[in-house]
Amino acid sequence: MLAAAALQSAFTSCPGRIGRGSVYWPSSVTLVLQDSSDYLLTLAPYLLGRVRRGVVGSSRYAKRLREQIRLAAADSAGRAVLISGEPGLEKDNLAALIHFGSAARRQWLVRLDGATLRADGANLFGQSGSDGDWSLLECLGDGALLIDKLDQVQPSLQLSLLELARTGHWSCPGEGSRPRHFGGRVFFTAEAALPAFDQVCDLIRVPPLRVRR
């Protein structure tokens, strides 16, 4: 029952992925249906299925923000994106606008709260000794990863995320874990400055709502 409920929740939150009698599984997942369901169960608690709203306002700040989102969505290289700004600006929604406006819109988008991530990255990369099998990143395949509140991530994990954004490489915690490659796009949001990430990400600085009208 729990599995069925999780699958139903994921389907209803991602209506664009479900056609008439068919589910648009990520292209990198070439498993049988049961394994595909297991992948989805891993992702279901984190899926973002739709955009809540667009960017409103007629000011030059709002127009510039819309243009930045358009350019990021059109980026064929799929560079990592860092969206920064003060609290309450729905920066995660802007990441969703970019993803669902891009050519990769049929891929999954998952969101993780940086404040809740373990320092060793097990939430993302899998438990020590698992070699990354059935980790969230493996299940995500070529989907998009959003780390919300990157500035609240533990410094040791920030280094791993920096490498993920720069090269796409990641590995499971623990010795002897083989390196893997993430084929999807990475989004970050933050309230504080993160100079190291400025070097490897496209930057979108979100103006306050009070100047965007």
Label every model-predicted segment.
Residues 51-52, 58-62, 91, 121, ...:
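The cytosolic transmitter module of two-component sensor histidine kinases
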